[in-house]
Amino acid sequence: MAPPLLTLRDINLTFGSNSLLEGAELYVSQRDRVCLVGRNGSGKSTLLKIAAGLVEADSGEKFLQPGTTIRYLPQEPNFSDFETTLDYAQAGCEAGDDPYQAIYLLEQLGLTGEEDPSQLSGGEARRAALVHVLAPEPDILLLDEPTNHLDIEAIEWLEGHLQNSTSAL
């Protein structure tokens, strides 16, 4: 069996005097399907941010297999530096990624790519943010509440897309 792509072991994190994560562990292997369940404020989003490299734990071990790609979908994406949804979607891609994948996914989700991100509805913003992380087809997708603001049609599209994805989720 191949070693995990991502390992978080004995992760501890406090905010002020409050312990948010104590001994948290997460192992993600190729094509895994993992779901974090817990109450509001229990550290699910923070654990995803640690896995994505956006927050540093107070202690514990994080290991990412060399060459592994990760994309993180935050609850509130930042569109402030982008003129169009296509600009934002393609910003998730790196050299070697198919730039047309972003165009294709935007169209699949009912966006043209010409929308001004500052004028998007909640659902449109969520769809653009999904394209930003889905287009590069990373090894690991970290999705923080991916169906927020989506209508049933977009949720069904996302479920189908993720079922066929080779990314670990």
PLM region descriptions:
Residues 1-169:
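ABC ATP-binding cassette signature C-motif
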